[in-house]
A protein has these predicted regions:
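Conserved PLP-enzyme active-site core in the AAT-like
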Residues: 1-147, 209, 213, 226-227, ...
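A glycine-rich phosphate-binding loop feature that marks nucleotide/adenosyl-phosphate handling sites
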Residues: 11, 38-41, 87, 135-144, ...
Length: 349
């Protein structure tokens, strides 16, 4: 339907992502509409939809019905995903999405006040010639060995300038390499441990907040918690005093008129950090907390969303480098194969 001009954006999508979409959509005559239902009404004027897993408040939902319903109306579905969450949940492609996007910041790259971070982009066969950038594929060399070459002609020389896609994205090569070696170092087992630990710590934090009398909704969550409370102003002030930066809820408000707070954990979070958080929250509401009373059994809980069944990263390279010395030697061996301006001139084109 070429007359369709509405693109749906789920409420789970980060606000800053939505603002970027607005900037791109306006000059193209595309109307963005946010929706918060898991069973929206799809009209003929809608051509696409963006969802996010986990959502901006950490919630994980099963998008199967939503995606299936969209496809029946010939609506393309794009998913913004967290690679660390993908370690645990069913691969996003198996849900039937058409396009998957995301940031690799999770894999060994500090937050850095917003970036830069390497992005990733994947799509089904239908959109392969619309992928931005230059696509490298595997082939066989004249000597019968595996080799890499540019696989799709997305360059300006072959396509009318306004439809060329090779020059509409920026290569964050160094950051992509850092994230790749993070996966090489940890492998399937290590990444699984990191992701599972995040879920367990988040669940433990939830149990501690319950003990302090807070009410938290029962959504399935990965690494984040949203709490609404009449004591949120006091909690925010106590957090700042103790060196923590909590999310101010609702979005767009400031500390003095906030009605809630959000907490997000990451790969560096540990039990000591959780205890510090619970301590300053307890102090803010004039209560005491006994960590021995917090339940510690069955903390890994992602009920309601299909989990990954098969192992991933099974190539030898993700199994062989578990010490820093081995990894350093491997990186250097690859660097020695590189040809750069250090070695000679590189012709353009």
């Amino acid at each position: 339907n070429k007359s369709a001009n509405i693109f749906l954006v789920h409420e789970s999508v980060y606000d800053h992502t939505y603002n970027v979409l607005l900037t791109r959509a306006r000059p193209l005559g595309i109307t963005l509409k946010r929706f918060d239902s898991y069973n929206p009404e799809f009209t003929n004027s809608i051509f696409g939809m963006l969802i996010q897993l986990p959502g901006q408040n950490g919630d994980l939902f099963n998008p199967s019905f939503l995606i299936s319903k969209a496809h029946k109306k010939d609506i393309s579905v794009c998913a913004s995903i967290d690679p660390l969450a993908q370690v645990l949940i069913k691969p996003i492609a198996h849900f039937g999405v058409d396009i998957a996007i995301g940031s690799m910041q999770r894999f060994g790259v500090p937050v850095g006040f917003g970036g830069p971070h390497a992005a990733f982009f994947a799509c089904n066969e239908r959109f392969r010639r619309l992928i931005p950038g230059r696509i490298v594929g595997e082939t066989i060399s004249k000597d019968g060995e595996k080799s890499l070459r540019l696989a799709l002609q997305t360059r300006e020389q072959h396509i009318r300038r306004e439809k060329a896609t090779s020059n509409i994205c920026t290569a964050q090569s160094l950051l992509a390499i850092i994230s790749s070696f993070y996966a090489v170092y940890h492998g399937c087992e290590g990444l699984n441990n990191i992701a599972r630990n995040l879920v367990i710590l988040r669940s433990y934090l939830e149990q501690g907040l319950y003990k302090l009398g807070f009410i938290i909704n029962k959504d399935v969550r990965f690494d984040s918690i949203d709490v609404y409370s009449s004591k949120s102003v006091e909690v925010h002030k106590s957090a700042i005093k103790n060196g923590f930066n909590l999310r101010i809820l609702p979005l767009g408000s400031d500390i003095n008129n906030s009605t809630g707070f959000g907490i997000s954990l990451d790969e560096l979070s540990n039990i000591d950090e959780i205890h510090k958080i619970l301590d300053f929250i307890a102090d803010a509401i004039n209560k005491n907390i006994d960590f021995e009373e917090i339940p510690k059994d069955n903390l890994f809980n992602l009920n309601g969303i299909p989990l990954r069944e098969k192992k991933f990263l099974q190539q030898n390279v993700f199994e062989n480098y578990r010490s820093e010395t081995d990894l350093m030697r491997y990186i250097f061996s690859l660097a020695e194969k590189d040809f750069s301006l250090v070695d000679g001139m590189i012709p353009l084109g």
